[in-house]
Amino acid sequence: MAYTADYDKFKFPEGAFKGKRVLITGSGKDGGIGQGLALAAAANGAAVVGVHFHSSYRDGFDMVDAMRKNGVKAFAMQADVTNTRDLWASRSYVIEQMEGQGPDIVICNSGLTEKGYRFGRALPEIDGESRAERRARVRREFIENLAESKLVMDTKIDGFVYMTHLWAGEAVYHNHPVQFVYISSMQSIEPGVAVPGYVVANWAVLRLPEVLKTNLGKASNMASACCLMLPFVRTGMTEEYAGNAKVFGRWQPRMLEPFEAAHAVSQLLSRPADELNLGNFKLGVEGTVDKVSLKWSQVKLEVKDEALGWSDANPVVS
């Protein structure tokens, strides 16, 4: 696959990226959410756009070329976000490409999905299968499915944590504020079946803004962070389900196109960074297949501690 996006569809009235140095992880794959966000930055006045990818190098290079043809200063960055040495090696390169400074906005979008499996449930039996064959099949499925879940969780959780540690550290050291935007999913708070690694990974990153603030302490004014919970967007990973309302119907009349999701994100990011800081924002989809209406809401993840009557009545005393 190569670059196929319509650049003009990503031109929006909002000025969220104007004059900013923007780095987007997981933005190389054609037709992906990351690509949409990178194009939104490029088409709406970003000073520099960093397009990160790991394996989607052909799509990524083609997109960077398209941006440059439109007069945008853009560069490609290849790295494994779960490899700390890879990321550290990219640091000086990114700063060089951004004319001696770190990014103003870091959008963490790296992530994978799962093909789906019967989490916590036994595999159905196959007629005529011997006990030995079933045991071998169950073992293989167990190993392969959990390996996939681990990769999904590592890519999202480790990737986001590593990028945050790297660029927050640069921001604090150089006294230059940075804004982190973490791309999560509606499934983080409304889990779907068969994709446990994906759900857990997207839930975990919702805590990152608070974790960052707590660790920065007095320097927390140098880095702000928020999480975006997106509904289903039609990408290479979701294309096969685009016509299946059983997959997305509880949230939306149809899957969003990447430029629609990018427009909504651009609208949200046009708000002041301190207004968005520590927030978890959910993108709702209303309307019909022919005409959708996208609206943001803020999700409060509050911890409520309730006493247990039986324990109050019989505490353990020592």
Protein language model regions, located:
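C-terminal helical subdomain
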Residues: 2-5, 150, 223, 227, ...
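Catalytic loop of short-chain dehydrogenase/reductase
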Residues: 26-30, 112-119, 123-153, 172-219, ...
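Canonical Rossmann dinucleotide-binding motif of NAD(H)/NADP(H)-dependent dehydrogenases/reductases
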Residues: 8-50
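A short, exposed helix-loop element centered on a Lys and neighboring polar residues
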Residues: 164-165, 210
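The beta1-alpha1 cofactor-binding region of Rossmann-like NAD(H)/NADP(H)-dependent oxidoreductases
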Residues: 57-58, 78-92
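Conserved glycine-rich Rossmann-like NAD(P)H-binding loop of the short-chain dehydrogenase/reductase
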Residues: 46-62
